Amino acid sequence: MASSSASATVAVDKATSDLLLGPDWTTNMEICDSVNSLHWQAKDVVKAVKKRLQHKSSRVQLLALTLLETLVKNCGDYLHHQVAEKNILGEMVKIVKKKADMQVRDKILVMVDSWQQAFGGPEGKYPQYYWAYDELRRSGVEFPRRSPDASPIITPPVSHPPLRQPQGGYGVPPAGYGVHQAGYGVPQAGYGIPQAGYGVPQAGYGIPQVGYGMPSGSSRRLDEAMATEVEGLSLSSIESMRDVMDLLGDMLQAVDPSDREAVKDEVIVDLVERCRSNQKKLMQMLTSTGDDELLGRGLDLNDSLQILLAKHDAIASGSPLPVQASGSPLSVQASKPADSSPKSSEAKDSSSIAGSSSPIPATVSTGKSPIDEEYEEEEDEFAQLARRHSKPPASVTTDPTSLESHNAASNALALALPDPPPPVNTTKEQDMIDLLSITLCTPSTPPAPSSQPSPPPPAGSDQNTHIYPQPQPRFDSYVAPWAQQQQPQQPQAQQGYSQHQQHQQQQGYSQPQHSQQQQGYSQLQQPQPQQGYSQSQPQAQVQMQPSTRPQNPYEYPPPPWASTSANAYYTPRANASASYTDTSALAGRSLQQSNSFPTRAGDPQATSTASNSGVSVGQKPFVPSYRLFEDLDVFGSADGKHNKPANSSNGSQNLSGSQTQQSMIGGRKMI
């Protein structure tokens, strides 16, 4: 018994739930079937309904009254007795006297008036119904007028049994209901499970009831059972449904799509429920109509309802809004804002592309609601694809400094940088060769003859003179600083060598050897490589300046630190007929010493090479960098290991000069 009471309470609570927007007819009819099958459940059901009538919510009270009315109309005398005994009528009177919700109050007055009349008034079987009516009437309550087409509470019995199975649905008062028949109401085993022949009127059953005995597990729903009671499809019904839909569409257009609480407004909730109900009715009407025009309009209205309800569900769930069909009737309202969507999308695209090249704000005010903006975002990709040929080409600037140049486009040419000069294909070794080859230049004017004796040149020295012509004249005017004599001269090498030559002109060569070595060697070693290495082109300009001092083409003056040995600085013209095989090694060594910064004074090989080295300087020969400083004697030791007799030195000098020139011209050094 306890389990049956609990199941009855759960069923009543479900049928009268506060979450329902309207009566749950399926649950109500299941409760009626349960009471008709098990009479002793009527007590538990009535008790649960009375408890729901005492609820504070007017919605729950209204649903409980609807369930009670359904039970009274579809159940027998045992339920009528429980309603009179459990003082449900007294509870209904209290609700009316408390001036509760007007809808609940009117519902109670209609039910009490119809019940007292159906049960025979004060002389009837259950006078409790009349007493409740009389109490309300004496308290000054005016009952509403009775409807002439209202269904009776107790349907009178039929005069003859039907010959066929009656067609009908729930809600139709059963014929002859209330007449107790033999075997009626006997509990059946396994109730709730469809049984063979259950619900089908049997021979001798007596008075058949329309739709009575439907099991709870049946797939036939209430909305399908009441399809025959739905009114036919007409233009007026379609227009009324469309008015409700348009009103809901206007309200959804005004709310924020991102605000879920906005759709919980009472008016919006009521309109949504009416639209859902209208959609169900419309589908039922479409199945029964034969007019093509009405069918087309009905299908169009159904599509619009479907789109509108999907939009409401999307806002309520916070999901993205669905894309509307362009031809749907609902999209007519947003047609004007949608016309400007291509322009706004173009403005968004152009502003996003030019965002890196222009500080202009990219916000475009179109005056549309957030819902229209959502639709535009959905259509942007297709709109851009359709307008890809008509959109102007957008210039994308990747330079971050072009923000200012965009505003000053007229001054763009003034800010353009000039083209860089063409690179000079020079290597570090080539620059060093140009610097050190200055000492190999031969003067064109003969210097003053030396007072010291010198051996005559070897025989055959003039035979090969024509083989080594003087190079370009631009290199014949320069004399190495340490090769200059003590005669006063004009300042030479003003760019790069003025400091060294002025110092030599002031002090001359009369100073002791040690002081001259300190002054000349230190200044020669430091300024010349730095200035000549970094600026090789000014050296050619310096060499073109003529010298006014007479020079001897057959000899060089001794350097300041040179020794006083005879024939140490006198060198004949380097044209010897010696063999190349004997002095090939000396020629390589003389080239190293000629290209070094300080050269030993007693080494005739270094000075012999300077006479005919102009050709190699003009053609800029290639010398490996690892051979430039191979024989450099930094400390200037005078041990004499490089000093050789004059005759041999002359031959080696001639050979080394010629061989060095040939080896440099050939691009490599012969050893």
UniProtKB/Swiss-Prot annotation:
Bilayer topology term: Peripheral membrane protein
Database matches in InterPro entries: ENTH_VHS, GAT_dom, GAT_sf, TOL_plant, VHS_dom
Biased composition (Pro residues): 444-459
GO molecular function terms noted in the UniProt entry: phosphatidylinositol binding; ubiquitin binding
Tissue distribution: Ubiquitously expressed.
Bias (Acidic residues) ranges: 372-382
Record-annotated GAT domain positions: 229-317
The entry's keywords: Acetylation, Cytoplasm, Endosome, Membrane, Phosphoprotein, Protein transport, Transport
Biased composition, class Polar residues, residue ranges: 395-405, 562-598, 605-616
Gene Ontology terms describing biological process: protein transport to vacuole involved in ubiquitin-dependent protein catabolic process via the multivesicular body sorting pathway
Family: Belongs to the TOM1 family.
Protein name: TOM1-like protein 6
Organism, as annotated: Arabidopsis thaliana (Mouse-ear cress)
Name of the gene: TOL6
